[in-house]
Amino acid sequence: MVKIRLTRGGAKKRPFYQIIVTDSRNKRDGRNIERVGHYNPVAQGAESRVVLNMARVEHWVKNGAQLTDKVRSLLKEVSKTQATAA
């Protein structure tokens, strides 16, 4: 099963996550199919908190990929900010 989920990076006490498409059997930081965005939970100032390639996310969801709970909430956050910006 293909999932869209987070993989951790960054330094100790300063996490940074890549939003990736991967097989559910792969390790958290293991092999991925495609990187579709990133999430910085400790963003400050002009740094962006969430960046997603919405076209690619929609493509993968249409092809059967499942979102994890956290990625689903980030997707809602991005769609809200895009709706208020437009």
Swiss-Prot record:
GO terms for biological process: translation. InterPro entries: Ribosomal_bS16, Ribosomal_bS16_CS, Ribosomal_bS16_dom_sf. It comes from the Bacteria. Keywords: Ribonucleoprotein, Ribosomal protein. Gene3D superfamilies: 3.30.1320.10. GO terms for molecular function: structural constituent of ribosome. The keyword Cell membrane does not apply. One of its GO terms (cellular component) is cytoplasm. The keyword Transmembrane does not apply. Belongs to the bacterial ribosomal protein bS16 family. HAMAP family: Ribosomal_bS16. NCBIfam families: S16. This is Small ribosomal subunit protein bS16. It comes from Xylella fastidiosa (strain 9a5c).
